[in-house]
Structure formats: C-alpha cells, structure tokens
Amino acid sequence: MTEIKLSGINEKGEEKEFSVSDFKGKKIILYFYPKDNTSGCTKEANDFKDNMNELTKHALVIGVSPDSIKSHKSFREKYGLNFVLLSDPDHKLAEKYEVWKEKSMYGRKYMGIERSTFVLDENGKTLKEWRKVKVNGHIEEIISFLEK
C-alpha cells in the first residue's frame, strides 16, 4: 500500500503531517465530509465531539475533507472539536476510499466528497463502511457497531 501523507491538526489543534502508518495498531473511525463550517458537516463534527468519551473506548476519530489547514483550525476552534482533522486538497485519501465522486446540485455537476465513514481495524483493514451518510442518527449507528 502506498503511503499517503497529509497535513492536518491533531486533537490538541497542533499542525502536523500525518501518514497512514502513524495510526497502525489503533482502531480508527475515518470519516470523510464535504466542507468545514457547513450545516451538515458541522452537525456531524459536533456529534463526534459530543460522543468522544464513548467513541474513544473503541477507536480514534479522524475527519477528512479537502479544506485547508487554516479552515480546519478555524472549524476546530469555533466548535471545540477534539479529534484529528486531515486536509486532503488533492483528494488522494478520498480517491483511495472511493469517496471522491461526481455530484450534482441545481443541475450543475462537480466533483466532491461523498459523506462516508469507515471503521478500520488495527492493521487498516475496513471492518465497516457507511456511504452516502445521512447525518441524523449516524453517530448512533457507529456506536452500535463498535459495541458489538
């Protein structure tokens, strides 16, 4: 597997470069979202933040979007987010997980992130995936899966 390196901010808000191998040995909830500071993405991020105590019993949470580090820092500070946010402007990781898709809004076609979540085991193998995620009720689906 090709090592993908992305810039991001850690759970403390510090900027750093991350690679997939940094997370080896840890179970991960990897979630892809379209854009910082938009209504659905903000609700989803707050759902992760508000359930962090339960989630971290099982896995590390990592959010990924094409947004810049500056945007991620602002998003994190505005909502008090407490997990890793990765910046994927060239959509390398999004393409690896096949979540960089053609979308359509008001008849206009464009490429963007298909809201998706993956639970990965300690070796990076996908245990569960949700695609075309609807934010309402999604955090409960994740917790239910993790508690099995």
Regions found by a protein language model. Give the residues of each.
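Chalcogenol-based redox active-site neighborhoods
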Residues: 1-148
